[in-house]
Amino acid sequence: MSRWRLVTDPAVRDLIAVSGAIGLVGAFVVPTTSLFLTETVAATPLMVGLFFATRSIAEIGTDMVVGAVSDRLRDRRTILVATALLNAAGAVGYTVLRDYYALLLTSIVCFGLGGACFGQLFAYTRELADARGVDAPFFNGFLRSVTSLAWVVGPPLAFWAIAQWSFTVLYVATAALSVVAALLCRWGLPPPGTQAAGTPPATAASDGPGDEEQPPGLLGMFAGVGLHTMILLGSVVLLLGANAMYQINLPLYVTDELHMNARTAGLLLGVSAVLEIPLLVLAGAWADRIGKRRLMIVATVCATLFFGLLPFIRSLPLLLAAQPLNAAWVAVAFNVPVVALQDSLPGRPGTASALYSSAFKAGMFLGGLAVGTVATWTGYGQVFWACAGLTALAGLLALFLRSAPHPPPRPSTDHTHPLEGRAA
């Protein structure tokens, strides 16, 4: 199936809707939770920080467990439905509970387990791409652009709903979106591996059920995670940690050191998110041609240059002019590594996607801690130098990926290195 004919596939259209709904759920909940805790249960800044830190740690563990278990299930849609409904339950909890510890428990149990939906969507996307005969980086980038669009419109809608009505209305809408996503997963998405009519069999398909090696499951979730995968994960954590530091630090830097309006930070983040949408698709389209490792190295160069320039930029036009560099590296970091991880763990898309999702959350957790430490001692502007250091180190790790031992590639007619791609 050609790339752009994908949109005529009913299963792909439903997957786009699911990705958009899940993206909006995250865009409604994540940016508003700190304000919700402060206004409804009078949480202190320390309590808010502990709330996010505890949830992040819990999500890392639940992502890995759900990912390993999902690879042994015959139908991944079961996990998608369950996690979407858990997100709905968490949103309902936010509408009725007004005790800090009850909200914390709800967040850990419902949103902690429900957050695994993010990684499972990656895994399902990979399986559907293989079944449709479409290159996975392009397909993944296409769907990630839908999530980015949700994050462009979601936060403004969320804060508008709070201003016009209340937190209750916002979280009821969040619960409804989660239920819609669950219904689409159950009755709109085909079983993973089902081929569209007229689609030739994928070259990686096995000849029979007995030819496919059974995934190791929960007790063996780290089986096959060798040096190559660990270096790749380290690079991802550093990149996403730098991104978290930037997003946390930017509003404080803009208002405290540049003395601009707080809306300026929202404008910068919004412009970058809009630019990311086409770049996500382009990164996916070019990943196999250029090579995933090369794209990651280019991304780290763009990121290091961007963060290295920020301390010297003092005007809004120049800040806006720098956003294409930011969007370019983020588009690669949010798309290519998850496909590379799936390539490094063939037959285990759930575990590989959970590793990426966990690395994403570990990067956010570590980035939040680093911002507080660096800003306290040196100021907000110096945080960007720390970001540049992290992305430069991520680039060095990406350089080592070629020489690191890696697992055998997936059985196919293409014998290129999973991170190198085809020769141009």
Give the ranges of each region predicted by the language model.
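Structural signature of the two symmetry-related core transmembrane helices
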Residues: T78-V92, A175, R294-L309, A388
